Regions:
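Extreme N-terminal starter segment of soluble prokaryotic enzymes
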Residues: 1-5
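Short beta-strand scaffold positions
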Residues: 53-54, 162-164
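Conserved C-terminal alpha-helical bundle
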Residues: 112-138
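GST superfamily/GST-like fold recognition
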Residues: 166-171
Length: 211
């Protein structure tokens, strides 16, 4: 029976500093590096056929660390921005507490946790293209890639590991667990903890749990 492992990258430096990160390419914090090592220890005994990550270094480093610990540094890998974190627009780089003070906690919650309301798209130094995404927008780019590239591997009987981000993984889990828009808003994916999905030979999920 094939396994699918989903893992959010270890804590990043901006997670630690409580800043909106999005597509800004921030490295892991020391704690995040340790979380990646702990994930590797938990995954000893698992053998993978393919790995997928976003193009952001915090996800790449997390997967590289895991593969080093489990002795699979030659695993075929595919990196794609479809698995990137949600783009937080003009909020990228800003402290969440400061945003709450400036715009109010309710507005902060809407930008962070609503399904279809994106943050402001104003151009900034960290958002030169004026981009911004809601969770709905993130799912619209993540899920087609997941269904076209990742699930065919799983359905072919391959064991797959995906290292990505809170919101791209929320999009995937929403589909796999058949969550409603309301349910996914309450879903929190912790950093650095492998989430296992076990499939049967017909492509049905037999079990899923955190390791």
């Amino acid at each position: 029976m094939p396994n699918l492992i989903l893992i959010r990258h270890g804590e990043s430096q901006w997670n630690l500093e409580n800043r909106f990160t999005g597509w800004v390419d921030i490295p892991l914090s020391p704690k995040g590096e340790q979380e990646a090592k702990q994930a590797g220890e938990k995954l000893k005994g698992y053998k993978f056929d393919k790995g997928y990550t976003s193009v952001l270094k915090r996800a790449i480093k997390t997967l590289d660390t895991i593969l080093g610990i489990i002795g699979q540094t030659n695993l075929p890998l595919e990196r794609d921005k479809a698995l990137n974190e949600r783009h937080y627009g003009a909020l990228q780089g800003l402290n969440k507490a400061d945003i709450g003070k400036k715009y109010g906690e309710e507005q902060l919650k809407i930008w962070r946790r609503s399904y279809d309301v994106p943050p402001p798209k104003d151009k900034t130094e960290l958002n030169p293209d004026g981009i911004s995404e809601s969770l709905k927008d993130t799912a619209a780019r993540t899920l087609p890639y997941f269904e076209a590239r990742i699930m065919p591997d799983v359905l072919a009987g391959k064991n797959v590991i995906v290292a990505a981000h809170g919101n791209s993984l929320r999009s995937i889990v929403m589909k796999l667990d058949k969550l409603t828009k309301e349910q996914v808003l309450e879903l929190n994916i912790p950093t650095g903890i492998p989430l296992l999905y076990v499939y049967d030979d017909k492509g049905n999920i037999k079990e899923h749990r955190y390791l």
